[in-house]
Amino acid sequence: MSKQQPTQFINPETPGYVGFANLPNQVHRKSVKKGFEFTLMVVGESGLGKSTLINSLFLTDLYPERVIPGAAEKIERTVQIEASTVEIEERGVKLRLTVVDTPGYGDAINCRDCFKTIISYIDEQFERYLHDESGLNRRHIIDNRVHCCFYFISPFGHGLKPLDVAFMKAIHNKVNIVPVIAKADTLTLKERERLKKRILDEIEEHNIKIYHLPDAESDEDEDFKEQTRLLKASIPFSVVGSNQLIEAKGKKVRGRLYPWGVVEVENPEHNDFLKLRTMLITHMQDLQEVTQDLHYENFRSERLKRGGRKVENEDMNKDQILLEKEAELRRMQEMIARMQAQMQMQMQGGDGDGGALGHHV
């Protein structure tokens, strides 16, 4: 009789090993198979290089170059919402990236109501998610909530404009704000540092809540702790974007060519582009968690306080029609039941009369 081989479910080499240590691998495989979803909103005046920066960040032509509107167009220019979704795959990991652009923001002569459209869009995505979450098919919910907002600040001023302050205060309880100084190549290093400090002071002065990177855990390696410290010290990020490849020091780099030299997009000594991209990639999960646990929960609690979830007009009409049909059906069933009862009583009465007459005869 041959000796029976141990099955693959038995691990005699490591007695006492249950297998819980493999759970992170299961979560990783499931997440990679499902893919990730992320929505990024970009807000800022025309001409600050928003489209170029987004294309540079994700190495894709997500946005065409826009034409800066003329003075006549700016008189009554309205804010639009343009959402573009692209599937990005890198080493087997899929990312469904949605970038929400806001052309027209800050371009009109009167900007008093220019950000109402943006706030309405953010609330609509919360509303849609709440509606889907409360429905029957909860396994296939598409998350279009805005997880992060890059707010572009002009480098040509001396800090925040009144519009910047008003807009950020209007959305800071709805979305994670990451302030970005655009076109950093127009500033010297000293000017850049002064502008950063001025913006941070004004953000604190006006009690604006921007996204704060979480502290590194105590068990993280020293390199990650140092990276987190540098990222925090770089806020607001001063960036340069470019989709052009130029030759610098014998190699091809993305950058901008000037008479006095080359500004390299991915050179940390020239600007904070790499730091901004690193922050977005390494903290993408945290941005989603803050959106879910803080901003969405605030919206959901407020909605429930006001009497439950808001139902769209179309759904409300459908529900109303169904209720009316059900009420009509119940009335018909009750009427049929009464008619059947009357017929039953008449039949019983007829049988009694017939029996008496037969007995009398």
From Swiss-Prot:
Residues 44-51 are annotated as: G1 motif. The modification Phosphotyrosine is found at residues 17, 211. Coordinated expression with SEPTIN6 and SEPTIN7. Filament-forming cytoskeletal GTPase. Forms a filamentous structure with SEPTIN12, SEPTIN6, SEPTIN2 and probably SEPTIN4 at the sperm annulus which is required for the structural integrity and motility of the sperm tail during postmeiotic differentiation. Required for normal organization of the actin cytoskeleton. Plays a role in the biogenesis of polarized columnar-shaped epithelium by maintaining polyglutamylated microtubules, thus facilitating efficient vesicle transport, and by impeding MAP4 binding to tubulin. Required for the progression through mitosis. Septins polymerize into heterooligomeric protein complexes that form filaments, and associate with cellular membranes, actin filaments and microtubules. GTPase activity is required for filament formation. Filaments are assembled from asymmetrical heterotrimers, composed of SEPTIN2, SEPTIN6 and SEPTIN7 that associate head-to-head to form a hexameric unit. Interaction between SEPTIN2 and SEPTIN7 seems indirect. Interacts with SEPTIN5. Interaction with SEPTIN4 not detected. Interacts with SEPTIN9. Belongs to the TRAFAC class TrmE-Era-EngA-EngB-Septin-like GTPase superfamily. Septin GTPase family. This is Septin-2. The lineage of its organism: Eukaryota, Metazoa, Chordata, Craniata, Vertebrata. The gene is SEPTIN2.
